[in-house]
Curated annotation (Swiss-Prot):
InterPro entries (UniProt xref): Ribosomal_bL20, Ribosomal_protein_bL20_C
Family to which this protein belongs: Belongs to the bacterial ribosomal protein bL20 family.
GO molecular function: rRNA binding; structural constituent of ribosome
Transmembrane segments: none
An example Gene Ontology CC term for this record: ribonucleoprotein complex
BP terms from Gene Ontology: ribosomal large subunit assembly; translation
Keywords: Ribonucleoprotein, Ribosomal protein, RNA-binding, rRNA-binding
The protein's name in its UniProt record: Large ribosomal subunit protein bL20
Function of the protein: Binds directly to 23S ribosomal RNA and is necessary for the in vitro assembly process of the 50S ribosomal subunit. It is not involved in the protein synthesizing functions of that subunit.
Organism: Acidobacterium capsulatum (strain ATCC 51196 / DSM 11244 / BCRC 80197 / JCM 7670 / NBRC 15755 / NCIMB 13165 / 161)
Length: 123
């Protein structure tokens, strides 16, 4: 069986890892094994971070909508329920954008939600 020295395969793989680790502190950017562990750990955090980002943005939207609803004399849950009863189908991202950039528009939505809740029969 012939001897395999791995020439460029090994060096290319190592260079790729060390390039990804550039900017890391001390040995994590210089030594292959430490760099490999640091890069793998970083990739794990990046993967989970992409999932957390979605949750955090949804939470931010809800906080913004809740604050704007409070200014209009409603709680977040009352506001969202009122919109649902009124048949207004806007997602939280859009509602948050309206709340931050168009206060008059949000107030109009809040009034519609209040009217829908007032007209709703008591269950």
């Amino acid at each position: 069986m012939p001897r395999v020295k791995r020439g460029t395969k090994r060096s290319d793989r190592r260079k790729k890892i060390l390039k990804r680790a550039s900017g890391y502190f001390l040995t994590k950017s210089k030594l292959y094994q430490a760099a490999q562990e640091a890069v793998e750990r970083g990739l794990k955090f990046a993967y989970s971070g992409r999932k957390q980002k979605k949750r955090q943005f949804r939470s931010l939207w809800i906080v913004r909508i809740g604050a704007a609803a409070k200014l209009n004399g409603m709680s977040y849950s009352q506001f969202v329920h009122g919109l649902k009863v009124a048949g207004i189908e806007l997602d939280r991202k859009v509602l948050s954008d309206i709340a931050t950039n168009d206060a008059a528009g949000f107030t109009a939505l809040a009034e519609q939600a209040k009217a829908a809740l007032a007209n709703q029969p008591a269950a």
